[in-house]
Amino acid sequence: MDVRRKVAAIGPNFDPDILEATRALYVPLIGKPSGPVKVTADVAYGSDARQKLDVYQPAALSDRVLVYIPGGGFVGGDKNSDGVFYVNLGNYFAGHGILTIVANYRLAPAHPWPAGSQDVGSVIAWTRANAKSFGGNPDRIILFGQSAGATHSAGYLFDTSFQPSGQPGVAAGILMSGPYSFQGELRPNLKAYLGSDQMKYAERSPLTHVSKNRTPLLLSVAEYDPAFLAVPTYELARAVTLRDGKSPKLAYFAGHNHVSTVMSFGTAQDDVGSAVREFVASVA
């Protein structure tokens, strides 16, 4: 596929220009959903303007609910920034019969740690309370975060202080290409969220809390994730393996960069989509 060659030419790098270049590659490739989808947009789950979510409802009842928390470098990102991304994700999974929720959350620097993971908790609480009214099963929620969204999702999954009664209220988690441990001098966007006190970074790292929760996980990394975004997934996989005595499910997406994974939903390049659907279907 020509898009694979173009992504490979970009290489293991990521910055705003690469984000836009990858977006331009995938916009023309997005197709229509494979089944009828009803969209309910901008549902409030909190009082802040950013605390909104979109619901993508399949035609039939859904035994599983996918909740997606997008990336954006802690200071940006949106559930529907341009009418394409991440509408493509909602349409793709709902078109395959999975009730899907795509949520925004509060951003740094106005809303530093722990706002992201707190908002994930609020999204999950809203989903548990409302899934049935959209034809979904609140007992089979799969939380899916990518990049900064994976950090916020991991923070919620592992740190019981963000969970009602110390339980995450989800059946499984998908963590894609996120940073999970922080130390030393951070990039400006990370510092905007985590603050400047390096003594607090360990406690604010999801990896620190991994022993507190055993929710089934799918971890993933892209071939062209830069090292600072790829290594944390392997560190998390190591910690989960030591905790459980066995490896978590770990996906390696060849030919993808940091964002082409989630931009490929709804295109003919279905490797990431089929892997996520297979994991969702496996959730008991």
What do the predicted segments below correspond to?
Residues 8-61:
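N-terminal cap/lid segment of alpha/beta-hydrolase-fold proteins
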Residues 28-35, 178-209, 215:
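Mobile cap/lid helix-loop segments that gate and shape the active-site cleft of serine hydrolases
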Residues 63-73:
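Short beta-strand element of the alpha/beta-hydrolase
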Residues 79-89, 96, 101-138, 267:
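Catalytic nucleophile-loop/oxyanion-hole region of alpha/beta-hydrolase
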Residues 122-189, 201-202:
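Primarily recognizes the serine-hydrolase "nucleophile elbow" in alpha/beta-hydrolase
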Residues 213, 219-221:
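Short beta-strand/loop motif that positions the catalytic acidic residue
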Residues 220, 234, 242-284:
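C-terminal catalytic histidine-bearing segment of alpha/beta-hydrolase fold enzymes
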Residues 226-235:
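Conserved alpha/beta-hydrolase "acid-adjacent" motif
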